[in-house]
A protein has these predicted regions:
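Conserved donor-binding/catalytic core segment of Leloir-type glycosyltransferases
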Residues: 6-8, 185-202, 208-212, 225-227
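N-terminal strand-loop element at the rim of the active site
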Residues: 9-17, 21-67, 143-147
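Donor nucleotide-sugar binding/catalytic pocket of nucleotide-sugar-dependent glycosyltransferases
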Residues: 132-177, 186
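Nucleotide-activated donor-binding/catalytic signature segment of Leloir-type glycosyltransferases, i.e.
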Residues: 228, 237-264, 268
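Acidic donor-binding loop of glycosyltransferase active sites
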Residues: 257, 263, 275-290, 306
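Short hydrophobic beta-strand element within catalytic cores of glycosyltransferases
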Residues: 298, 303, 307-310
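Conserved acidic donor-binding segment of nucleotide-sugar-dependent glycosyltransferases
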Residues: 322-335, 343-349
Length: 381
């Protein structure tokens, strides 16, 4: 029997990021077997999953979004009578849990890392108690679950459902890949790929400062391709910028080894870059109150047969299978990071394409849908 599910989230495309892609896919997958109402910001309407009933409110300012989400959730509960209320992140948890209690429905909160780890006083007073009161809390990784336990969330309420990936990936478009190679003069390059928003946590500036110079010294034809930009709507204001990173590169005389291509929302273009890359680099910094919740880009890279070199911090330890889909490096050990990149580029057989893709298969969105539906079924029994 189909369930009526209301998903309340601020994180949807065209905003760019892993949380946005995850929430879109959760809504899309659940709508295949349930009746899904989606409450989010107005800009998301045109890109929302086609089987969802979309309800819109303004994205900014944040307090207006939260107030209107609170009011509109009440109205949807009153008129549509959903069986389950689902918060797409900790941000909307108080709204979802409050109205679920009032209407005697079930509540689910999906947490990503920062939205449970933050030590903001208001968050500790209002948000954490409401997350604890949810009927079910889904963590995106083992480290995020561990943070939940430390924050007092009952182990009986906790489940881990990692973000998914489109598998099999889009087929290789050889003509478009050739166009990219010609446009950016890539034919004789070894390509390192970085995909993600330019924040302090992603650590790209530190990578350029402390690891890339040694890589360039040993492999002069290396090119670091950066997909992503400084986020404009992020609640996390610890940011980096293209200008900062290029200034750091200039200090080492390696600006010619970096290519910024900006944000890419077209999956076909992004897929081609994954196929083009020799390695995906993920030099995320360990910041105690700002953890990397999972690392969807590592799974996306693996699905295309591209291995990842990453620091072993946060949920990355769930996203990268060490010695299978990549190599995990001790946090902040930039010397080992650069040596591992050099060794892997010179010995590509140590991390082969087939192992990467086989490992990525278990993260398919189909598997995510199955696990979500099982959880919903258990919640209603």
């Amino acid at each position: 029997m189909k369930k009526k599910i209301l998903i309340v989230t601020r994180n949807l495309p065209p905003l760019i990021g892993g949380m946005e892609r995850l929430n879109w896919h959760i809504a899309d997958e659940l709508s295949k077997t349930n009746k899904v109402e989606l409450l989010s910001h107005s800009d998301a309407r045109n890109q929302a999953p086609k089987n969802c009933y979309f309800n819109s409110i303004p994205l900014n300012p944040l307090y207006i979004f939260l107030i209107l989400a609170f009011i509109k959730t009440f109205w949807i509960c009153l008129t549509k009578r959903p069986d389950i209320l689902f918060a797409g992140s900790g941000l909307t948890a108080p709204i979802v849990v409050f109205w679920a209690k009032i209407f005697r429905k079930k509540s689910i909160v999906y947490v990503h890392g920062l939205d449970i780890a933050t030590n903001h006083e208001l968050y500790k007073i209002i948000w954490l108690p409401m997350i604890r009161a949810a009927d079910c809390v889904i963590a995106n990784s083992t480290p995020t679950r561990d943070i939940c336990l430390k924050k007092g969330i009952s182990a009986q309420k906790l489940s881990i459902i990692c973000p998914g990936v489109t598998y099999p990936p889009l087929p290789k478009n050889y003509d478009f890949i050739q166009l990219l190679q010609e446009k950016y003069q890539l034919h004789d390059k070894k390509i390192l790929l970085s995909v993600g928003r330019l924040t302090q946590r992603k650590g790209l500036n530190e990578f350029v400062d402390l690891a890339l110079p040694n890589i360039v010294k040993n492999i002069p034809n290396i090119l670091l391709v950066v997909i992503g930009d400084t986020p404009s709507h992020s609640l996390n204001k610890n940011l980096q910028s293209k200008e900062l990173i290029l200034a750091t590169a200039a200090k080492h005389h390696i600006t010619g080894n970096i290519l910024f291509v900006g944000n890419i929302s077209d999956d076909h273009i992004l897929s081609s870059w994954y196929y083009l890359a020799d390695l995906h680099v993920f030099p995320v910094k360990h910041i105690p109150n700002d953890p990397e919740g999972f690392g969807m880009v590592a799974i996306e890279a693996a699905a295309h047969g591209t291995p990842t070199i990453a620091f072993a911090t946060g949920g990355i330890v769930d996203a990268v299978s060490n010695a299978i889909t990549g190599k995990l490096i001790l946090m902040n050990d930039y010397q080992s990071f650069s040596k591992t990149v050099i060794f892997t580029l010179e010995n590509p057989e140590v991390l082969n394409k087939e192992n990467c893709q086989e490992s990525a298969k278990k993260f398919s969105w189909e598997n995510v849908k199955t696990r979500l539906n099982l959880l919903i079924q258990e919640l209603n029994n």
